[in-house]
Design a protein with these regions (language model features):
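Thrombospondin type-1
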Residues: 90-91, 261-333
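Extracellular low-complexity, O-glycosylation-prone Ser/Thr/Pro/Gly-rich "stalks"
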Residues: 36-37, 75, 85-92, 98, ...
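Structured domain cores in non-transmembrane regions
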Residues: 29-32, 37-45, 53-165
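Cleavable N-terminal signal peptides of Sec/SRP-targeted secreted and luminal proteins
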Residues: 6-27
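Short beta-strand elements
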Residues: 168-185, 318-328
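A short, structured loop/turn motif at beta-sheet edges
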Residues: 143-149, 175, 291-294
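Conserved beta-strand elements of beta-rich interaction domains across eukaryotes
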Residues: 53-57, 158-160, 248, 305-309, ...
């Protein structure tokens, strides 16, 4: 007859095995996305329109006006399934993402996508022309297959250390139905490979590289950062994408387009972002000057670091004076 101790040990072992099985049952893979399978019977044709909203009214702080002025790189888009990620917030940037975010070079990014296409995890790659201004439009047509219904894209901000906008694994299919229209507001991301704080910062590699992070009005929490707006709860969208499904007959299929839309299309309007004045610390007090009979006066100054814009807080006084006793008078006392 087995002792109660042996029975207890056996029961604990069985419980442990059950718990381990449950863990493996519910712990799915980390990178692949769950619930993204598309069961549509045929591909869908879309037109993708990228719109830049990067204006001195919405983003007045350190707005790039020349060498080079604010502009957008070419757009790189990839259709894929759940086993591929072009980029992902909270993870390190690949070599291709780094080179594109820092330099606008697409060679390694496209090479990785082509290799993934051989493994049938990437469907197709698309691109649009760059936009020479902060405000503008570009577009391309896409033919999305059910087996690769996710869309990821990137556009580099020029100039910037390693900043970009984009979407990660946007699903254009829901069950067996293609979505008719999708609009997404875009915000800046930091690739984590360059430590520059401003649009025109010199090259300053981050060592070791950090994860891709979203830039907000409060992060990075440093006054020197070009997107630091402490009065704002969140930044206005700096760009957006609109994806519209197109009807397409089997007999006539127009060629894929890759063009900049005319400027006659009205850009989306956002309220102007207030930019408060920023001043330096006070200098040291100057010499106390004046006759001993009336007492002396000393001065100190500060200077403007950032001029206000869009009804931001005006600059305070830049010079201050106070009464004092001249040093020569103290010697006679």
């Amino acid at each position: 007859m087995m002792s109660s101790e042996h029975l207890t040990c056996g029961w604990l072992q069985q419980l442990l095995l059950v718990l381990v099985k449950l863990c493996f049952t519910f712990a799915g893979p980390l990178r692949p996305l769950i619930g993204t399978e598309c069961t549509a019977k045929s591909p869908a044709s879309y037109i993708l329109v990228f719109t830049g909203h990067w204006s001195p009214q919405a983003f007045p702080k350190q707005y790039p006006l020349f060498r080079p002025p604010a502009q957008w790189s070419k757009l790189i888009a990839v259709s894929h399934n759940r086993h591929f990620r072009l980029w992902e917030e909270g993870t390190p940037a690949s070599a291709g993402v780094q080179h594109f975010a820092e330099l606008g070079v697409t060679v390694e990014l496209m090479k990785a996508a082509k290799e993934a296409r051989k493994k049938r995890v990437v469907g197709a790659m698309y691109r649009t022309a760059g936009i020479p201004n902060g405000i503008g439009h570009s577009s391309t047509e896409m033919l999305i297959q059910p087996r690769s219904s996710l869309l990821s894209l990137m556009v580099k901000m020029i100039p910037s250390p390693d900043w970009f906008v984009g979407v990660d694994s946007l699903n254009l299919c829901e069950g067996n139905q293609w979505k008719q229209e999708v609009t997404v507001d875009l915000h800046p991301y930091d690739a984590g490979t360059d430590s520059g704080f401003t649009f025109s910062s010199p090259n300053f590699p981050t060592s070791p590289p950090e994860n891709i992070t979203k830039i907000t009005s409060q992060f990075p929490n440093h006054p020197a950062n070009s997107f630091y707006y402490p009065r704002l709860k969140e930044l206005p969208p700096i760009a957006s994408i609109r994806i519209m499904r197109q009807s397409r007959s089997r007999d006539h299929q127009s060629p894929m387009s890759n063009h900049i839309l005319p400027n006659s299309i009205s850009p989306q309007r956002f309220s102007a972002t207030p930019l408060d004045c920023e001043v330096s610390l006070w200098s040291s007090w100057g010499l106390c000057l004046g006759p001993c009979s009336r007492g002396g006066v000393r001065h100190r100054t500060r200077y403007i670091l950032l001029r206000p814009a869009n009804a931001g807080t005006p600059c305070p006084e830049l010079e201050e004076q106070s009464e004092c006793v001249p040093h020569s008078c103290m010697q006679h006392q």
